[in-house]
Design a protein with these regions (language model features):
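Gly/Ala-rich beta-loop-alpha elbow adjacent to hydrolase catalytic centers
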Residues: 154-163
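Serine-hydrolase catalytic core
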Residues: 68-75, 222-298, 312-323, 329
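Catalytic nucleophile-loop/oxyanion-hole region of alpha/beta-hydrolase
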Residues: 119-147
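Short beta-to-alpha linker loops that shape the active-site pocket of alpha/beta-hydrolase fold enzymes
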Residues: 113-118, 182
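Short, surface-exposed "cap/lid" segments of acyl-processing enzymes
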Residues: 59-114
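Hydrophobic membrane-insertion alpha-helices, especially the h-region
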Residues: 4-20
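The alpha/beta-hydrolase serine catalytic core
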Residues: 32-63, 181-246, 290-294, 302-314
């Protein structure tokens, strides 16, 4: 028995060493520097349209775009709004809330498109990295700064994660709106993806592709299939951003909204607990941050007519944040 226990202990130790020295996943190396974009608004829109038209397999109506406050003048506005969608989604994930907010406050709106979003290629995300994932958000902010004197960034899900990163590195942002930000996924086992043997574990558990079962209309605006390399990248980015020392760097006004009714009826895509842990750690003064649960939204995606049963409530609460915290004056009354 003693020899057996010694043998068993040795085997466990050997397996532990083998796990620890297994293939590793590199840490994200994120650079906060924004890219340079033209300040000529006519040229800027043309460049966006041209680059989007060149994307192979981009599905109709998924392209990034500028929504002008005044289509006749197409000029810089006092405020601009940048919308950053979530993992594998599109601008439709925040529609119509982002458009209604932009109209109400007379703001130019930039609807960004992240790397590989909106394409029909089933291998989408096969080359996604934390660096090119974040690059899309940085370009969106650079465009937003060109479109408005002050920028408000709205992010949903993984777009909220990217928005948090932008807020820590660009304090000039006027305010951020986080709809169901993906600070951690609901199923915490994804954290294994960035541990030794993580890629192998992920491929064995999930397969090389994730395939969605969205209904036909929604599937036009969300990826139907993507490489699970994207999940690896998502976890790498969360590892880099979802940290207390990151949260305390955020000083500007923050609106946090999510779906939560009770322990059973809540967001089961991303972790509400992780959002609630983040909120008190933000460096933003208490008077400048708002946390709201939307129990009737019924879905992780709370600001889209495709998914949310209470996008109107989400919009109203965000308007109150704009009015009372950001001190923005409406220029239009929506019917």
């Amino acid at each position: 028995m003693k020899k057996f226990l010694l043998w068993t202990g040795g085997l466990v130790a050997l397996l532990a060493v083998g796990y620890a020295v297994g293939p590793d996943v590199p840490d994200a190396e994120l650079d906060p520097t924004l890219p340079t974009v033209t300040q000529n608004l006519t040229q800027l829109e043309a460049e966006i349209n041209r680059s989007e038209a060149a994307i192979p397999d981009l599905k109709p109506d998924n392209e990034a775009r500028i929504v002008w406050a005044d289509t006749a003048k197409k000029q810089k506005t006092p405020y601009s709004i940048v919308y950053i969608h979530g993992f594998g989604a599109s601008w439709a994930e925040g529609d119509p809330v982002h458009k209604n907010l932009a109209q109400r406050y007379g703001a130019n709106l930039y609807l960004a498109r992240m790397h590989d979003a909106g394409i029909s290629d089933p291998d989408a995300f096969d080359d996604l990295t934390p660096e090119n994932f974040v690059a899309g958000a940085k370009r969106a902010l650079a465009i937003g700064k060109t479109l408005g004197d002050s920028v408000i960034v709205i992010g949903t899900s993984a777009g909220g994660l990217l928005t948090v990163y932008l807020a820590t590195t660009h304090p000039e942002i006027k305010g951020i709106v986080l709809y169901s930000p993906c600070m951690a996924v609901y199923n915490s086992t994804l954290k294994l993806a960035t541990k030794p043997w993580g890629r192998q574990i992920l491929n064995r558990a999930v397969g090389e592709h994730r395939v969605s079962d969205y209904e036909s209309e929604r599937s036009n605006y969300w990826l139907k299939s993507y490489s699970t390399n994207g999940l690896m990248t998502l976890q790498q980015t969360m590892d880099a951003v979802s940290q207390p020392e990151i949260y305390k760097k955020i000083k500007m006004p923050v609106f946090l909204g999510y779906y939560y009714k009770n322990d059973n009826e809540q967001d089961k895509v991303v972790s509400v607990a992780a959002m609630k842990e983040m909120f008190p750690l933000l460096g933003t003064p208490d008077s400048l941050k708002v946390e709201r649960a939307f129990p009737e939204s019924g879905n992780h995606v709370i600001a889209s007519h495709f998914t949310s049963q209470d996008w109107q409530g989400v919009q109203y609460a965000t308007e109150q944040f704009f009015d009372k915290v950001l001190k923005m004056n409406p220029v239009a009354t929506l019917q």
